């Protein structure tokens, strides 16, 4: 992470750049040209300018002020990382937090500016020179990079800014000029995902996508999101930390499929595979020319996952059809091979987790207390021993005591603490196996607990079980079920601000849509074959955190005269710590569910454990 001094210098240099471009503010989102949650280092401009390294957030710099918006998962971490920098934390989602446009407007007190260059584009020098050192009454300008902002985001931001008398200007990425030693775009080799794990040929997937395009009246589409490209073509990569994807675009029409990526990434084996499947390849930068020359009458773009510049490159004769991603709902429903892969991956992951928990128990018993980083390294090492392990699926969250209240905490040498034989350890982790992706959270009692720790742990467990036990009509959306995870804690006046669950990719991104469990409305229906996490939590700043998470598979429950009903089947196989539970708070059916779950965990994992590990696991049920 950058030193605070470096952040201050970068903001100073950016302000000089802004004055040269005639800008009064500049906005840095978290995304890249592929509009994903996780991005290669090359496009981590928000982190570069602010020092905040969370996966979600927006940094805004004006000529005199700076602020960063992020959600509740990162409130505590962001406050710490922004301390000593020009950036003020804006807690997104809270009633008192202003919108970005409101805040910018409040920071710009009048519209009289000395223009040194009223153009964002470096080649418009004539207009800039004519305005040099001249004073005008103008509309204050807010700059963004059109390559890293979605179509929907640009429109919404433009409307919001205009309402408060500000003008949105799309132009260059200032980091191109200011970021010293900026990492390049990754050129790691692409790999083929075998059919035994993919479960469907890329030819079949392409045919399904073409059929969906025809139904929407579109002749073609640009696929931007990296996990969608990887899924569609049955390819994987290592360009994004913890996510097996590669930097590319796909332009698909009814007659052709073209993959735009760095030629260095294409091995001999992959080149033969692409040729066999009639997939053309062009350099990554070739998409610009291809869109400018696009001859189709219509092109479908997803406004929430396509960057603004894609549509602006198209000829005026091309009609853009806007529609939510056609691939996301296809990818979300796992086929038989993918489900089999998930089940097998969860067994291996469960074995690694049990071995880790046994190790932790012995370490605490011996007095050789590990640190949070030790916990991370040990668990990763045990996972790496498992067949088909490729990587972790996200940076491990090992938060002891107060660190457990930092929802997306990551231990560093500066923050690392040694565990003690008391309190709670919140451990959220996962792995990328070639046949499946895992995501699991366990909160572990290391010794005596306070009544608050026990009660919070029990409320979280009750919420997890209530949602996990749900039976619901096919087509129900996650918003309608989210309350089940929160109901028990709401009775105590407790809540958490993050979502309750997200989809999980098949050896792809650990966060996947379009379905979720969350309070705000998400229209995507829950359907058989979808994977989704259930992860309620309680976080007390400066004290402790508790979260319990399993990855679930949505399966058919029963058909009646009232319709089809679905249920959630746990895929994750790992014991849930029972020592913190206040049993008087648990209902009989909740206890029965927990007992049945632990019985299944033992039956499925014990064949792969040694006698000592079996004995310990047997005590957990």
Q: Can you say where each PLM-predicted feature lies in the sequence?
A:
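Active-site neighborhoods and metal-handling regions in enzymes and metal-associated proteins
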Residues: 1-621
């Amino acid at each position: 992470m950058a030193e605070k001094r470096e952040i201050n210098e970068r903001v100073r240099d950016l302000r000089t750049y802004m004055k040269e471009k005639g800008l009064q503010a500049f906005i840095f989102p978290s995304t890249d040209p592929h509009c994903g949650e996780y991005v290669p280092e090359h496009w981590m401009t928000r982190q570069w300018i602010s020092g905040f390294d969370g996966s979600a957030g927006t940094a805004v710099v004006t000529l005199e002020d700076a602020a960063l918006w992020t959600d509740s998962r990162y409130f505590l971490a962001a406050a710490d990382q922004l301390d000593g920098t020009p950036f003020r934390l804006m807690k997104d989602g809270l009633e008192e937090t202003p919108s970005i446009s409101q805040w910018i407007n409040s920071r710009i007190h009048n519209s009289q500016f000395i223009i040194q260059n009223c153009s964002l584009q470096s080649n418009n020098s004539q207009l800039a020179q004519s305005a040099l050192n001249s004073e005008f009454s103008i509309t204050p300008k807010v700059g963004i990079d059109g390559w890293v902002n979605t179509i929907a985001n640009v429109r919404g931001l433009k409307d919001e800014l205009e309402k408060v008398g500000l003008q949105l200007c799309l132009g260059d990425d200032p980091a191109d000029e200011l970021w010293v030693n900026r990492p390049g775009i990754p050129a790691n080799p692409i790999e083929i995902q075998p059919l035994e794990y993919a479960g469907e040929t890329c030819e079949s997937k392409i045919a399904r996508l073409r059929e969906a395009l025809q139904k929407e009246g579109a002749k073609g589409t640009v696929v931007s999101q990296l996990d969608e490209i990887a899924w569609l073509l049955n390819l994987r990569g290592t360009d994004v930390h913890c996510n097996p994807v590669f930097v590319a675009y796909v332009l698909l029409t009814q007659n052709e499929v073209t993959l735009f990526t760095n030629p260095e990434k294409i091995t001999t084996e992959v080149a033969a595979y692409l040729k066999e499947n009639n997939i053309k390849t062009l350099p990554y930068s070739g998409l610009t020319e291809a869109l400018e020359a696009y001859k189709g009458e219509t092109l479908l773009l997803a406004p929430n996952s396509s960057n603004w510049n894609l549509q602006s490159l198209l000829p005026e004769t091309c009609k853009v059809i806007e529609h939510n991603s056609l691939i996301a709902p296809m990818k979300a429903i796992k086929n038989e091979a993918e489900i089999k892969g998930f089940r097998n991956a969860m067994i291996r992951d469960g074995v690694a987790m049990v071995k880790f928990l046994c190790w932790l128990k012995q370490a605490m018993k011996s007095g050789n207390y590990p640190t949070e980083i030790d916990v991370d390294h040990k668990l990763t090492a045990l996972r790496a021993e498992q067949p088909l392990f490729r990587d972790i699926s996200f940076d491990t969250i090992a938060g002891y005591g107060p660190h457990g209240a930092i929802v997306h905490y990551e231990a560093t040498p500066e923050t690392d603490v040694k565990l003690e034989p008391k309190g709670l350890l919140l451990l959220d982790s996962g792995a990328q196996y070639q046949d499946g992706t895992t995501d699991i959270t366990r909160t572990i009692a290391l010794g005596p607990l306070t009544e608050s720790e026990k009660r919070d742990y029990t409320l979280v467990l009750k919420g997890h079980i209530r949602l996990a036990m749900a039976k619901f009509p096919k087509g129900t959306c996650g918003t309608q079920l989210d309350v089940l995870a929160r109901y028990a804690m709401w009775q105590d006046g407790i809540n958490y601000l993050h979502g309750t669950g997200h989809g999980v990719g098949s050896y792809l991104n650990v966060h996947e849509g379009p379905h979720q469990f969350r309070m705000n409305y998400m229209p995507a229906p829950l359907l058989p074959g979808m994977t989704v996490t259930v992860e309620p939590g309680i976080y007390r700043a400066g004290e402790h955190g508790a979260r319990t998470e399993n990855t679930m598979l949505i399966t058919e429950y029963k058909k009646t005269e009232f319709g089809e009903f679905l249920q959630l089947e746990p895929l994750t196989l790992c014991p849930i710590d029972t020592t913190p539970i206040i049993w008087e708070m648990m209902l009989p059916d909740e206890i029965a569910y927990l007992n049945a779950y632990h019985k299944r965990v033992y039956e499925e994992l014990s064949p792969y454990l040694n006698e000592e590990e079996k004995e310990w696991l047997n005590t957990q049920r």
